[in-house]
């Protein structure tokens, strides 16, 4: 093994090795275990959320593969309709072309060319993360099989009357000219205005005043709504007002949805351009007026002076005209929530359009029953409530998009606009008994990306055909995903799975938190706080990081702020940490049900953990290679050997429990504590006492060498699911020494807990001697004895058991405690000039004479005592102040009391030491 651990030297080697030998294929004979990768966008690059989620999935997959299960991690990418179309359109724009210039077929050809050329970036990055996906089965949501499955699903749902075409309000992106889902809308609060507008009464004098943040939609108003219990407006309900700037009158209606406290308490109702107004309009059977074109210009349904104006230009003119006609009461500043398209960046409009929908109520009921009956489980369980609430309030799903890239709807129209659904023109002619001469035009819309994504768990396995893969791996075991897509993806997969396969698509849903920055903020390009996981693995210079964060910002003015923040947070850029340190960090941070604030300090600690493992493995191999490890010869285990073997069994049990409960954080904690605190810090040091003892017998040496090797080899297998690269590299050296043969640790057996390997007496003895050594080390540190200086130790009190243990563990205590000589106290020993510690009944005394410099130590103690006395005085002053006790929060007062207690205890200890040293 090399002297230092260099992840760059090994990671690509082992990733290529695993893939070349197809070790991720489901070849084992055990029970099937399958996880579906939430397909990342083909346009995407790996971000921290991907890295976190895929680490958790890979940990599960590697664990179950090692348990001998027939394990499949089904991977693939999503065609990402809007995102991909935008990327290719931007490329065309650089050639001064539009998609319309190319035409649909040529444009689709260009998209496929782009996908072949650039679409594999994210899967390459995933390989860097070490994910053990079966790449030979990789799917793409637009490949032939998945396209066939998507068409089949649409046709079956339509045949059952669950798909229909209708006019409804949708999120409309005027730049992309398509409907988009709620998930593709990003709402941000900006400084805006609240305009108070007078609506004159149609009869008599007077007016009602409404407050709005969107005066341009006034031209589509069809009513004024007030709360039925609002006494101010009860006399006006049923009357009419004149709609400003038009020749229309509209009614005043009462509806409980109106917020009496907002604005003036009266609300303009524009059902064609507001989702809440649409619901009110439906209840009161109000007309729907659409005043916008698909590009966001005012249409022919508005008075002539406003036709053709861009929506925000129209706003300016309407405000000016209202002022001129004395209909603008006042304008006040107001924080306005503005919905923007995630991809286009433009403000989204609720727009009334003809779209295709799925009736969701009938699909939602069995999906709810699956959770209520316990057939489908959420982890943590509290997410079941969120899932059920969403499904109980479900609306019909708009599945059509006005794009060119995607699954085209299997719908054709004749010249009379009659629609026909089928797999092809030929099938439709036959199915509907149409003349071969009839002219049929296919629907230009494509399906929402989430529609094909909802089929992912079974379509990727061959559905609608009953393939071997489908029969073996469906339903899958667990879905690992974030809470933000429980409704958009999880619930829809459950509904589609139950409807089309009559089975739930997975037995469990593990919901993880979102990765945020160190301050708890969501990571986003606009905030400039995104960290690329590959940059953590490989490292990146400060200049390159700033360039990456400030390039192609939607708001270029943020560049200076982002640069300043980046320089402060990463003054030296980001160091190279390697994949295993990053993966271990992700697992360690994966507390159930909580978002994760990513702290670079944690990953620095886990890089040190990698180094610790490496150095321990080097020590083991250096002390076992070409040594006598003959299993035929007798061996004798020391108490420390028995102790570490016992602790290993407990670690196996704890790791198994943590994984079975999806407690990745507890898994990491268990492995870290055993590896660092017990194997490296204690056992390796205990082993040296045997290995470096010239009096040690061959059987003792063999016992310790075998224990070092066997425990390390098993520990590597426990660590492997989380840290695949370093464990594979070390295992390839360690396994032959431990008498194991195999092509990869990846397909070795997961360690089995064996209660017969546990020696409780050795456990008690070694924990006792650890406490004794720790007490000696603590006393040395407290009185300032150099770590290299050997000291005498006298034991007082204790019993026969303690004496036997000390005799047995003498070499451990002397070596690890840096003790020159140790003995039990005599009757005439005086302990006034000693530092004293206690372990159970045993007293530990370090004579101070000749061990320390009296005057130097007295000066140091005086300084420390003075410092603590000032802290004590400060705390007492606070706690004696009645005002402080009354006004400060209870938890602050309690914290101060605990601080005082801690200070006083430390003070007593130092004063005792001072008295002891002064008496020398």
UniProtKB/Swiss-Prot annotation:
Residues 642-668, 849-920 form a coiled coil. CDD domains: Anticodon_Ia_Val, ValRS_core. Keywords: Aminoacyl-tRNA synthetase, ATP-binding, Coiled coil, Cytoplasm, Ligase, Nucleotide-binding, Protein biosynthesis. It comes from the Bacteria. A motif ('KMSKS' region) lies at residues 522-526. One of its GO terms (molecular function) is valine-tRNA ligase activity. GO terms for biological process: valyl-tRNA aminoacylation. It catalyses: tRNA(Val) + L-valine + ATP = L-valyl-tRNA(Val) + AMP + diphosphate. ATP binds at residue 525. Its EC number is 6.1.1.9. PROSITE patterns: AA_TRNA_LIGASE_I. Pfam families: Anticodon_1, tRNA-synt_1, Val_tRNA-synt_C. Catalyzes the attachment of valine to tRNA(Val). As ValRS can inadvertently accommodate and process structurally similar amino acids such as threonine, to avoid such errors, it has a 'posttransfer' editing activity that hydrolyzes mischarged Thr-tRNA(Val) in a tRNA-dependent manner. Belongs to the class-I aminoacyl-tRNA synthetase family. ValS type 1 subfamily. Monomer. NCBIfam families: PRK05729.1, valS. This is Valine--tRNA ligase. It comes from Coxiella burnetii (strain RSA 493 / Nine Mile phase I). The lineage of its organism: Bacteria, Pseudomonadati, Pseudomonadota, Gammaproteobacteria, Legionellales.
